[in-house]
Amino acid sequence: MAKLTTEELIEAFKELSLIELSDFVKAFEETFDVTAAAPVAVAGAAPAAGDAGAAEEEKTEFDVVLESAGDKKIQVIKEVRGLTSLGLKEAKDLVDSAPKAVLEGATKEAADKAKEALEGAGATVTVK
């Protein structure tokens, strides 16, 4: 097997959707028995309760979670495919396994547009 350079790996990761990259990270963690949790997360939990409102306003990344597909499952699958780079089978599997994140780390605008599109197709969606 040819050895890939760091640059080649990064280029390959750039082509993955957030869901595919998340699945890769989970598989990597399981295979090598490591965790990708950033040590900064511990420091982020330290602010006092009075700062909770400020932290809420500063949130810049949002997850769009598909809670259920509703009655129009085919339309929801089409919207999932449009929002992600998933193929038909992967999009169907994602919709079938709801509740599941459709987009992770999206901007507020992208998350709102995705929620609107999915709800327009008949899905129940939450933005976290």
UniProtKB/Swiss-Prot annotation:
Keyword Protein biosynthesis: no
Gene Ontology biological-process annotations: translation
Family: Belongs to the bacterial ribosomal protein bL12 family.
Quaternary structure, from the entry: Homodimer. Part of the ribosomal stalk of the 50S ribosomal subunit. Forms a multimeric L10(L12)X complex, where L10 forms an elongated spine to which 2 to 4 L12 dimers bind in a sequential fashion. Binds GTP-bound translation factors.
Alphabetized UniProt keyword annotations: Ribonucleoprotein, Ribosomal protein
Any one of the GO CC terms: cytosolic large ribosomal subunit
Species this protein is from: Kocuria rhizophila (strain ATCC 9341 / DSM 348 / NBRC 103217 / DC2201)
Gene name of the record: rplL
Protein name listed in UniProt: Large ribosomal subunit protein bL12
InterPro entries: Ribosomal_bL12, Ribosomal_bL12_C, Ribosomal_bL12_C/ClpS-like, Ribosomal_bL12_oligo, Ribosomal_bL12_oligo_N_sf
